Each structure stands twice: as structure tokens, then as C-alpha cells.
Amino acid sequence: RGAESDHVLVLVDGVRMGSATAGLPALQDLPIDQIDRVEIVRGPRSSLWGSEAIGGVIQVFTRRNTGKVRPNVRIGVGSDSTREASAGNGGGIGRGWFGADVAYTRTDGFNACRGTGGDAANPFGAGCFTDEPDRDGYRNTSANLRGGYSFTDTLTLEANALRADGKSEFDGSYTNRSETVQQVLGTKLRYTPSDKVNLLLSLGRNDDKSDYFHDDVQSGYFQTRRYVASAQGDFTVAANQLLTAGIDWQDDRVESTTLFAVTRRDNLAGFVEYQGRFGAHQLQASVRNDDN
């Protein structure tokens, strides 16, 4: 649809994720073993989710263990000295449920680039402008905790914590290794007094940090810390007609070896959306106001 990767909002269990400086998250570091499903909304959704969603929304849901308590273990190997292992436990107990998982992935990789730093034939170099004939690997360590409890049939509390540490090696004259940290914390309180009313209060925090190195010497880093809160109500006003109203707030803070004129911003917004289905036709109308 002509949008770029930094035009898409990424949510992990409802919490906004991503770097305020790069404009997009490190999706490659999210642990696949701990993802239950991914939902994608294509097209502009800024009126509901804000300016980060002008190209769409990607919502990642981690696994929710509500059945019988059951441990799990998985081990795998592959080419390029790839090995991975994961273990976890979770399930439902009475009116509550819990889940805990850890995972580790490592591959020694291969030589990512055969470049030159400059010679008589090409004094400016070529490729990645350096000659590092080594294997460039990747490592990822992650942990995910989540749980919930239903106080009544209409009132439910959930909480989740996800952390993923990644290390990528590559060839480059300025940087040849990056280390990333992705952390998501969230809690939700849901109240559903009837099948026509759904109220949700959410709090969350996201930490995104990227460190860059050249031959084990740090060359720079970027860190974003984001706090979010929202209150939303969904109301079924008639058959196949839904009215959504809410407010959301976020506070972004940036630290880096690069000097920025502004290192903190906050945004308070209110929104209303109507969705209706009439036979083969759909109608959607929404409005949002942001104070940034």
C-alpha cells in the first residue's frame, strides 16, 4: 500500500513496542516459540491508534495457557551450527492461569560479506568496505511470564512480562556487532458487565535498547523507554454495530550517544470510532485528537 516499515504500529499483548529513534521495533528478536498468534490490520488506522499506525497495525499475542498444567521442552539443531532449546510450564488453576517459558537460539552463521577496504584497483573499497573473513552468527535468549485471574465472570486481571536479548554479528568498517534488548511489561483489567459492554484498562512499559560495537569496542547506543496507559470501552449499540471510545497516554524517553535536541515527549489522545455492517457493506467512521 506504499507504506514503509516505520509506518506500522507493533503491539505485543497490547503494549506499544519499538524504538523512538529508529521508528520501528526489532521484530527479529521476538521469540517465535512464545507467540500464540499474530493479527494484522492493513491500511491507515491512525484515528484509533495514533500517527504510528498510518500504514497498519501488527498485534503479537504471546501464548496463554488455560488448559491443564503441562510442561514442555524442545531441542533442535540445524545447519551452520544452529542449535536451539526451549522449556516452559503453564496452565489453568481454578479461576486463574499462568505460563512461564525460556528459550535460547544460537547459530554460528557464515561470512556475511566479502568486501574490500580499498586497494589499487578500487581505492574506495567495495561491498561492506572491509575484509573480515569470519563467520557472523546470531544469538537470542528470551523469557516470558504471564498470568491472569478471573475474580468474577465479568472481572478479569491479566499481567505479562517479556524480555528478549539478541546479539548479531556482521561485517562492517564502523560496526560489526549489535546487541539488542527488548522488554515488554503490561497489565490489563477487563470488565464485561454484559454481552454489549466491554471495558478495558491497560498499563504498560516497553524498553528498547541497541548497542553497537566494532571489534568489542562500543561505538554507540540508542535506548527508548516508553510508558503507556489507556482506557477503552466497546459498546454494541445495535445488531452488527459497535461504538468504541477511549483515551490513551504515552511517554517516550530517549538516551543515546547521539545528541538529540529533544529526548522526551508525551502524548495524550482521545478517540471515538463507529463500525457497522449492513449486509455486504461495511461502514467505519472515527475521529481522534492528540495533544503531543
Regions found by a protein language model. Name each.
Residues 1-3, 33, 41, 80, ...:
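A short, compositionally biased micro-patch
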Residues 7, 36-37, 56, 62-77, ...:
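Transmembrane beta-strand segments of Gram-negative outer membrane beta-barrel proteins
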Residues 7, 15-42:
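Short acidic/polar hinge/loop motifs at secondary-structure boundaries
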Residues 4, 64-66, 91-95, 153, ...:
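A generic beta-sheet turn/junction motif
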Residues 21-24, 70-72, 111-114, 170-173, ...:
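Short acidic, glycine/proline-rich loop/turn micro-motifs
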Residues 148-165, 180-292:
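Face-selective signature of the C-terminal outer-membrane beta-barrel domain
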Residues 46-47, 59, 66-68, 74-76, ...:
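Periplasmic-side early beta-strands and strand-to-turn transitions of outer-membrane beta-barrels
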Residues 2-4, 12-14, 42, 62-64:
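Flexible glycine-/small-residue-rich
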